[in-house]
Amino acid sequence: DDDVLVIAHRGAAGGAPENTLASVALALEHGADVVEIDVQETADGEVVVIHDSDLMKVGGNPMRVWEATFDEIRAVDVGSWFGPEFTGQRVPTLEEVLETCRGKAVVDIELKYYGHDEMLEQRVSDIVERTGMGDQVIAMSLKGDAVVKMKGIRPEWDVGLLTAKAVGDLTTAEADFLAVHVGMANSAFIHRAHEAGKDVYVWTVNDRLNMSRMMSRGVDGVITDHPSLARLVLEERAEMSPVERLLVTAAFWIGLEPKEPPADLDLEG
């Protein structure tokens, strides 16, 4: 059987506004094993959950996260852009997301850097310590030195490197797991990573055939905007014979569904 984690990308971002408590709650409702979120520091040192460097996409506001106080950021509605039913959603704190997921799912904390971070790794560590959820978090970053720094502060955590392109041999990177664009995750790469003791998570996978193809290749986790679909694919595969699974992979190659999108950092990031 497949031993694959369903990792909800920015919460269940296909069904609710990304990185909000609504998307986190939906991810839990849809059976995510792991809830992935992005964190940054505000001007006054709060660790908040938001992907972009400003609030234009989610709030129609050019306010930059590192220049604004937590209260200023909290005043912005970051739900109505997605749908009127989400009006009133606010940028949550890391602590709020951790409390929402307590005892229900692992939280994958992606450390975001836009050149203005001060103590992000230490502050994240302190918040997790304060909530007593050290055994329920993992962390990752696009920056290799941030991975090393976070691992230095929290050697007991699984800390991973996130990447959209192969630079050298990633399997030798100082990281516990590799979160790679789906286009990089060929069978040879996955095998080398596993030989090096590293799990492989792929992002961002939002269609059935790609999900099934990645599961057949032996990835350890699928990062998706649609955790309910990933859970359904896992359930369907559990009922399939090996031949039926091969037919699903064949369907991908003859073009029954679109192949993976080009590697674009904003797909994850």
Residue ranges of each PLM-predicted region?
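Phosphate-group recognition and catalysis centered on beta-loop-alpha active-site segments
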Residues: 1-269
